């Protein structure tokens, strides 16, 4: 047949396929989420997230060593306190779990890059992401506490803060607080487009952050909405966000693509606990090839426009990159 264009010509060998690959993935763009908890000598597996653990501060360096050897240099820290109260005071306590973990980690592994999740839900007795007035989350009263939390993280050694609470105005409040304290160069990665998703279930088990009543639909986004997500992203950029995150990843790559096209800031996405747990469960049953699925999910996120990928599979992806299986 007289064909001028034969797309298969560029698929003829692995070398050629890699040469013309449109999406490039590098280990430096991976972020690994880590859970730190109170106690001593603790390295406990999370039942709903096989292969993921909660670490006490004294055990955290062992995992940081493993990450360093894997070539993963970016960490997102989540704290699990023993004490919880109505206003989440442990979140901004200078001797809180995240603050102590940061100081210890920075002492032993100063070359790693530490990002902290800024929210109240792990620290409040009611499990909501802010201060309550009756059964409603009081937006403006929460902003000061979020800003105090972010500042306490930075002063303990955080290189970047990532507010995940979805309160209106939180980026501005944090930016102004950090600037006033002399931290003008500390970037903010905002969970700007965070949907009220069923994919968060295993995380809430891991962090002990399930709400005691109701849900988070009054502050997290309705998953039916696209234009609202764009509004959230643009608002956070105006308030000073340096990086915009879309969360979850797999079901929201349309939003990744939309925000990527409409803005000029780096885009991140978080492949969340439910996505991880689904892959693990299906792989355990022998229904899927875990490694190939992990690579395919990551590539789809980068293809949609992300330059930063938060994933519980960061160590595995780093190995796959080294082996030439992705990237």
Give the residues covered by each predicted segment.
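N-terminal amphipathic/basic leader segments beginning at the initiator methionine
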Residues: 1-21
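Alpha/beta enzyme core
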Residues: 13, 25-31, 37-327
């Amino acid at each position: 047949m007289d064909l001028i264009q034969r797309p298969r010509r560029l698929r003829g060998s692995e070398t050629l396929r890699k040469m013309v690959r449109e999406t490039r993935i590098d280990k430096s763009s991976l972020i690994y989420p880590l859970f730190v908890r109170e106690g001593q000598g603790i390295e406990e597996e999370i039942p709903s997230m096989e292969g993921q653990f909660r670490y006490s501060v004294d055990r955290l360096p062992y995992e940081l060593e493993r990450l360093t050897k894997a070539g993963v240099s970016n960490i997102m820290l989540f704290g699990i306190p023993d004490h919880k109260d109505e206003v989440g005071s442990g979140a901004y306590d200078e001797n809180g779990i995240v603050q102590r973990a940061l100081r210890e980690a920075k002492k032993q592994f100063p070359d790693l890059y530490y990002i902290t999740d800024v929210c109240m839900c792990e620290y409040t007795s009611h499990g909501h992401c802010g201060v309550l007035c009756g059964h409603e989350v009081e937006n403006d009263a929460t902003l000061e506490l979020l800003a105090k939390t972010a500042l306490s993280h930075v002063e303990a050694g955080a290189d970047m803060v990532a507010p995940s609470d979805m309160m209106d105005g939180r980026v501005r409040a944090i930016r102004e607080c950090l600037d006033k304290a002399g931290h003008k160069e500390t970037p903010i990665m905002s969970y700007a487009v965070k949907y009220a998703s069923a994919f968060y279930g295993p995380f809430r088990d891991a962090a002990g952050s399930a709400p005691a009543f109701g849900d988070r639909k009054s502050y997290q986004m309705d998953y039916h909405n696209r234009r609202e997500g764009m509004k959230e992203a643009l608002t956070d950029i105006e308030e000073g966000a340096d990086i915009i995150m879309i969360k979850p990843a797999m079901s929201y790559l349309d939003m990744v693509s939309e925000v990527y096209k409409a803005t000029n800031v780096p885009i991140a996405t978080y492949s969340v606990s439910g996505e991880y747990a689904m892959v693990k469960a299906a792989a355990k049953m022998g229904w899927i090839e875990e490694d190939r699925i992990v690579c395919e999910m990551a590539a789809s996120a980068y293809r949609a426009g992300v330059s930063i990928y938060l994933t519980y599979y960061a160590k595995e992806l780093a190995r796959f990159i080294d082996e030439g299986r992705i990237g």
